[in-house]
Amino acid sequence: MKRPMIGYTLSLIAGIGMGKIFGTEYVFLILCGVFFCGLFYWGKKSLRIAGLCFLVGLSLPFLRDPLWDDGFNGRYVKVEGRVERVFQKGENQKLLLQGEKMNGAAVREKFYIRGVTTEYVPGEKISVEGFFRSPRAQKNPYLFDEKNYIRSLGAAGSIQAENISSLECVHWKLKGHLYVLSRLREFSRTTENLLQRSMLGYGEGDFDALREIGLAHILAASGFHLGLLSFFFLHFLLLSGLGKRQASIWTVLVLWLYGAFIGFPPGLLRSLVMFTLLIFSVPFRKRYDALDALCIAAWISLFINPWWLFQPAFLLSYGGTACLLILYPALQAWGVHKILALPLSVALGLLPWQLHFFGQWNPWAILANILLLPFFMVAFIGAFLYLIFGFTPLLGSILKFFVEQSSGIFLILSEDAAELPGRISTAAWNLPLIIVYFILLYLLFSPATRQWQVKKSWRKFLVTGTLFLCAAPCFQILYPPFVLRHIAIGQGDAALIQGSYNLMVDTGGEKYGYDSGEGILFPLLRKLGISTIHGLYITHLDADHCENALELVKQFHVKGVFLPPQKEYTPWFQNFLLLCQKKKVPVYDLTSGEIHNWGNLQIQNEFADLSGNDGSLMQRIQMDKISILFTGDAGFETEKQLMDRFAPVKVLKVGHHGSKYSTGEDFLRKISPKYGILSCGENNRYGHPHQEVIEKLQERKIKIYRTDTQGCITVKSCFGLRVSTHEEETKEIFIPWLLGAVFVFVGLWTGKRVKDEDWI
């Protein structure tokens, strides 16, 4: 039997991904139409079906988008409904509410509730008053995307709770959660939190040590937990005297009830579908195929909510399971013992996703899954037995003892293992790199590759060669010799220069109720694999340009700070200088006309002998034929004094966030830029950028880029000068790699098929 289901599922996934990335762009849709017309005319039947699956996937993000339009955005609303899921306990609890009424009218949408200060449990009926907000897409690469997350919950938007009241409700889910929580409170606080997280999917405690050693999957109900429960219930019912078929059916019913009880998270739903297919394959006399069952589970999950595809829970669950099914027999065939082959195959499947989402991987995770999980398994099964039999004094005491001891040993050993050296930290992997990783993994381990005869070995070289030929020009796109990112930091300035050295010009930092350092700047630097800043330039000491510099020096290795001469010794600035002294970070006072060479990158520093914003540092950055001018918050007077010192540039960082008191006509005429970049916050209180500045730039046909509407603006040396928005950069690095993946996919599809027993 052939395995077309794998190809059809990959086609569906590719379609969903393309629909999300490219949306309804006409050029993309036309190219898809031309490609699939050719495919349906010349392609084989299996390729036609794969093309149809791709088109289905392409439409799913639009057909299953739960978000409302902006009609309610910013409005004060009152919603009544039932709590469906709880995401966090404590002072800042978050809920998923299944709405029933909104402002008195019946609704069926779900809402993500923030700022909940009272603890609630699933099944509880509540009334929420607050401001409705449509989620915003992430404007910087690699960071948490609130819009996709809200979509993955199936919610129409979020509500910042101002007032919450409980309503009378008698619901089976509420009663069940209250019973489980009351019984778990009989354990110690740490054990209670661990069991709440693993059984119910919410609870207090961070358990950072488990994340450090790759055991974070036990903190949310997943396939691992379902496997333990199925093993326990099936054998318990068999020992009770039920026949195998009856015991299997009752086990399936109990597991689906448990899934409904905690809200069917993606990993648990996958396991439920696969286990159900396994159980019912026997009476229907159908051969169970684990990979096909995995594909069926993926189809069901993605039809329920295609936005799950972009969430860690879905990718880690399906990626780990797929690699377990494919690599486990291959590793055993290579002579790896089955005890080691099991966690190793899962680790290989999870590796790229862990590097993508977390930027780090711990090799000790393989041994941790072998040595530590048995202790957790005892605690988990013991806790379920305690929920059922804990009311009997003797048996309850015995079960409680074993649960406490095994969970305590598990957590102590986890904390010790987290202290071991060897953790690998790197720049976050992007999606094209992950695709290539899995293709190469397939080429290395698949039975199709192993069974190709020598006379057909040209296929392997053709496929692999095509891949790398397509990938070669992308290397410069992904890792160009010069990249300058104008980070979407809000109302402020922050620019990161990557080349031979890592440099920063300003850090942003004015709070406006949100910490842009902890929320944007520092996570982005870590995702980019940056731990050292070789030079930090501060144009002037306004908070929106430099306030994050204090924490930057604390959390990263900064080798030098460069300041303009105009300084006001505020308490913040004095603390900053003391911290630099404590961390032995050199602080340099710049002089006008000073030239800095960072490899093949040259920075010309200039400033006027003026105070306030007009004392801002202005910099001309030159690398090969690429030239960029930073102006800080300099106004007309500074521009007039300094413009003769600068040669024309290709890119202008427009002064003072687009204020009408900056960027004069004579200045623009002198430096003659082709691109203008405006760094400002969305709907900021200053009205930046001012319309007068926009009109000046448009009159001179300067292409305008804005961080408030277009997100992070990237300038890079990619076959010359390239300026792109966050959305454009995502697309341009994806297309060539996609072409390579298509060639490889077609080559593998048309290659020699293999028998099922070669896989499993």
Stretches with model-predicted labels:
Residues 1-71, 148, 152, 158-163, ...:
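N-terminal leader/targeting segments
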Residues 226, 266-268, 512, 541-546, ...:
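Active-site environment of divalent metal-dependent phosphoester hydrolases
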Residues 641-711:
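Cap/insert and terminal regions of metallo-dependent hydrolase folds
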